[in-house]
């Protein structure tokens, strides 16, 4: 997945600027650890090694799934580009071509995301949401081998590795809000390098940048990590519309907020919706001790 993402950005840079880009592989803790992400620091574990390589001068650019990127600033590093966002929706891959409504009672659904598990349980409280790790091919194999009845993954990730045909249902944001930044890529470079920043302006999509700015502003204001059960999705060109939700991990409580603002007001839009959610009691849900996903036997 990481190589596919990097190649996507490299090809875009070459097509738009004529500059050739070499892909340099970097192994992260998130790639090698078999522990659940919530146990080893959340999806930010995919970011640290890349940033270290960037600061050490081993690479000039680092490409991340934007939803993995911590919201706080990183010393010496700049978020220099957000290319056009891919499809942000979540997708189900289930046995025998089944949609969510077709699955048997108590069906086993694999997901390592508290956000996905919570929204699945809100849709169907009888499901068994089981924790999974490994790359997308490993997860898909657990379905074809019969270990799981289905898995929920990001549509964009499946598309990048050529597995769209395996999808049996795509969840609209009204059914399952994506993670903040889902479907978008982030390109970081060392701060204080104007030539690199100027180069990356060629691949930045301003509408995508505004949308993810609003979503990440909300996440930061809620003081929640990227593994928290929070969904957010903003879209629009001149005028942004955004929906957000905070949920209990068992799906029994979901707090929602929505609003709009001009693209230039993206950051404040995220703050405003976060404030609305906090007034509704979101901090209680974010701060509730969470049982491991696999223990939600309902």
What is each stretch, according to the model?
Residues 1-40, 122, 126-298:
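Small-molecule-sensing regulatory modules
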Residues 35-61:
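Short, structured active-site "lid" loops
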Residues 59-63, 149-150:
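Short, Asp-centered acidic motifs that coordinate Mg2+ and/or phosphate
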Residues 66-69, 75-127:
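A conserved helix-loop-strand patch within extracytoplasmic ligand-binding domains
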Residues 70-71, 160:
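Short glycine-rich, flexible loops that bind phosphorylated cofactors or substrates
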């Amino acid at each position: 997945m990481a190589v596919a993402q990097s190649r996507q950005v490299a090809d875009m840079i070459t097509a738009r600027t004529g500059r050739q880009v070499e892909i340099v592989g970097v192994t992260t803790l998130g790639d090698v650890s078999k522990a659940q992400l919530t146990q080893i620091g959340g999806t930010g574990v995919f970011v640290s090694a890349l940033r270290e390589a960037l600061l050490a001068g081993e690479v000039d650019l680092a490409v991340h799934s934007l939803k993995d990127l911590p919201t706080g600033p990183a010393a010496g590093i700049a978020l220099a580009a957000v290319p056009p966002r891919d499809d942000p929706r979540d997708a189900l891959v289930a046995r025998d071509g089944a949609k969510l409504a077709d699955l048997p009672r108590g069906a086993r659904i694999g997901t390592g995301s508290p956000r996905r598990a919570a929204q699945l349980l809100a849709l169907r409280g009888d499901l068994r949401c089981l924790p999974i790790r490994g790359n997308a091919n490993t997860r898909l194999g657990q379905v074809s081998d019969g270990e799981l009845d289905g898995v929920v993954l990001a549509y964009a990730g499946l598309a990048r590795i050529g597995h769209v045909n395996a999808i049996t249902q795509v969840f609209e944001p009204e059914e399952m809000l994506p993670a903040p930044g889902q479907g978008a890529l982030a390109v970081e470079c060392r701060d204080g390098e104007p030539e690199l920043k100027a180069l990356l302006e060629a691949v930045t999509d301003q509408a995508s940048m505004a949308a993810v700015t609003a979503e990440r502003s909300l996440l930061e204001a809620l003081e929640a990590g990227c593994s928290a059960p929070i969904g957010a999705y903003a879209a629009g060109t001149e005028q942004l519309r955004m929906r957000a939700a905070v949920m209990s991990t068992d799906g029994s409580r979901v707090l929602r907020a929505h609003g709009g603002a001009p693209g230039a007001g993206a950051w404040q839009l995220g703050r405003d919706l976060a404030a609305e959610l906090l007034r509704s009691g979101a901090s209680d849900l974010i701060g509730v001790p969470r049982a491991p996903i696999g223990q939600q036997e309902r």
